[in-house]
């Protein structure tokens, strides 16, 4: 008997070595789901140490908020039956064909979870990209949090002069605005957004720039393409297939379908294990994250210099509103991933010293440009303007990204002089956005630029002095 136990010990050790998502208490890979990452998992935790500026009082706030957690596009919803087919194939591999791999196999609890998985049939194609219940709570929660730290700015009584809200023409941003307003003012409130213009050049400039839309950052020769074709990436696809009991490499579309199901279901139910995340080892998720980061880096980030021009109007909007001494005191925009990423790019936030490439995956594990941390569902960029009467430069600002103070090398531990902000972004402030924002020209000029910025500020100051 003792000999039998000794012989079985190596087998037990092997079984215990198999990674088990359902038993992993840290689940660090859930922080690496790129733009499908749950906000509650990656949001900052130090705002309570960063919001209070000694000798200063918060005066104004400018917000750009990505919509909360949403449903997938119609194309993915229509593939739910394929996910069920993959489920059955995996179970057959393990229980009938007996093609379970010797190492890195699914643990029993993850296998059972996959076997019991069913698609939520209440999610239909006509609901594509709708805000989910968790997405609504994401926005309601961020409003409550910022109001807790800035009660004198984010007042609980709605006033359409004091507050200005704006969102794009989609269900997910409309509902995100409503959730945010509920977080500030309660469920029975009169908050309303400004009218959406026919051409939304402020929140969706990328829709009106043909050269931006026509750039193929995934074409042959691109860094995305090179990484996609790399041995590391294709070995990852093969290893995932083996882990699931297949004797051949699955089509990438099938693997990505399981990966997306993992990401979405984790974001929909933050406190529960997403069944399909068990299909992947943590290091495989890291590879997928880098491919996503390359996509966003070149599609909306620092990969192409022109991307920094695209959100010219939004940067001017920020500078104009925070420069004016009069209302609105709170400006909040509700938009999308591309809007947020191009805004951060225009402001030089989360910029790496070395460009992301296909060949420097290993050396950029600590990169600043991580879409999972920058651009999760419900990502938000908040600028808080302070008045510091005892200082020579009495106007200051702190930028927050997902509840974490942004560290810029020309600021002091996250606190920036407003005069430095105006100087740093002078090129954009002075620009005629109609000509500046699009690589080959865009919509006609709307009279923006330094003239418009100064004129607006001076007019506001005159009104302020007259009162």
Swiss-Prot record:
Residues of this chain annotated as glycosylated in UniProt: 120, 159, 234
Subcellular location: Cell membrane; Apical cell membrane; Basolateral cell membrane; Cell projection, Filopodium
Signal peptide positions on this chain: 1-15
Keyword vocabulary terms for this entry: Cell junction, Cell membrane, Cell projection, Developmental protein, Glycoprotein, GPI-anchor, Hydrolase, Lipoprotein, Membrane, Signal
Propeptide, residue positions: 442-467
Pfam family, one: His_Phos_2
Post-translational modification: N-glycosylated.
InterPro entries, per the entry: His_Pase_clade-2 (IPR000560), His_PPase_superfam (IPR029033), Histidine_acid_Pase_euk (IPR016274)
Keyword Hydrolase on entry: yes
Single Gene Ontology BP annotation: positive regulation of filopodium assembly
Function recorded in the entry: Probable multiple inositol polyphosphate phosphatase that hydrolyzes 1D-myo-inositol 1,3,4,5,6-pentakisphosphate (InsP5[2OH]) and 1D-myo-inositol hexakisphosphate (InsP6) to a range of less phosphorylated inositol phosphates. This regulates the availability of these various small molecule second messengers and metal chelators which control many aspects of cell physiology. May have a dual substrate specificity, and function as a 2,3-bisphosphoglycerate 3-phosphatase hydrolyzing 2,3-bisphosphoglycerate to 2-phosphoglycerate.
Full protein name: Multiple inositol polyphosphate phosphatase 1
Biological classification of the source: Eukaryota, Metazoa, Ecdysozoa, Arthropoda, Hexapoda
The gene coding this protein: Mipp1
């Amino acid at each position: 008997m003792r000999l039998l136990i000794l012989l079985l010990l190596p087998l037990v050790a092997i079984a215990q070595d198999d990674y088990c998502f359902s038993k992993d208490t840290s689940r660090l890979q859930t922080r690496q789901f790129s733009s499908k990452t749950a906000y509650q998992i990656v949001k900052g935790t130090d705002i309570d140490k960063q919001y209070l500026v000694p000798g200063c009082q918060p005066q104004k706030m400018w917000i750009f908020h990505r919509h909360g957690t949403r449903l997938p596009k119609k194309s993915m919803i229509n593939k739910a039956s394929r996910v069920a087919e993959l489920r059955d194939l995996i179970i057959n591999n393990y229980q009938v064909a007996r093609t379970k791999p010797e190492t890195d196999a699914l643990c029993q609890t993850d296998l059972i979870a996959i076997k019991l998985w069913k698609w939520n049939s209440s999610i239909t194609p006509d609901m594509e990209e709708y805000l989910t219940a968790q997405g609504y709570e994401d926005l309601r929660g961020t409003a409550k949090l910022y109001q807790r730290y800035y009660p004198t700015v984010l007042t609980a009584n709605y006033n359409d002069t004091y507050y200005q809200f704006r969102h794009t023409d989609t269900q997910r941003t409309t509902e995100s605005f409503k959730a945010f307003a509920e977080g500030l003012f309660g469920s029975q409130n009169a908050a309303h957004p400004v009218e959406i213009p026919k051409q939304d050049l402020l929140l969706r400039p990328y829709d009106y720039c043909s050269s931006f839309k026509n750039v193929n950052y995934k074409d042959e020769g691109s860094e995305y393409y090179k990484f996609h074709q790399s041995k590391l990436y294709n070995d990852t696809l093969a290893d995932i297939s083996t882990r699931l009991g297949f004797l051949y490499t699955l089509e990438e579309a099938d693997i990505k379908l399981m990966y997306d199901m993992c990401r979405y279901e984790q974001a929909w139910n933050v406190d529960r294990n997403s069944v399909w995340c068990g299909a992947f080892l943590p290091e495989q998720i890291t590879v997928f994250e880098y491919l996503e980061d390359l996509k966003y880096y070149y599609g909306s980030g620092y990969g192409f210099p022109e991307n920094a021009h695209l959100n010219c109007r939004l940067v001017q909007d920020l500078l104009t509103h925070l420069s004016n001494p009069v209302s609105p005191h709170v400006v909040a925009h509700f938009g999308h991933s591309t809007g947020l990423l191009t805004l951060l790019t225009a402001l030089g936030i989360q910029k790496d010293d070395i460009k992301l490439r296909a060949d420097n995956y290993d050396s950029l594990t600590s990169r600043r440009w991580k879409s999972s941390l920058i651009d999760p569902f419900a990502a938000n960029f908040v600028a808080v303007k302070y008045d510091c009467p005892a200082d020579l430069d009495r106007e200051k600002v702190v930028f927050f990204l997902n509840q974490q103070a942004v560290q810029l090398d020309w600021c002091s531990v996250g606190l920036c002089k407003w005069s430095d902000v105006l100087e740093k972004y002078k090129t954009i402030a002075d620009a005629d956005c109609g000509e500046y924002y699009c690589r080959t020209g865009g919509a006609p000029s709307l009279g923006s630029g330094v003239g418009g910025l100064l004129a607006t500020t001076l007019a506001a100051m005159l009104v302020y002095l007259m009162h």
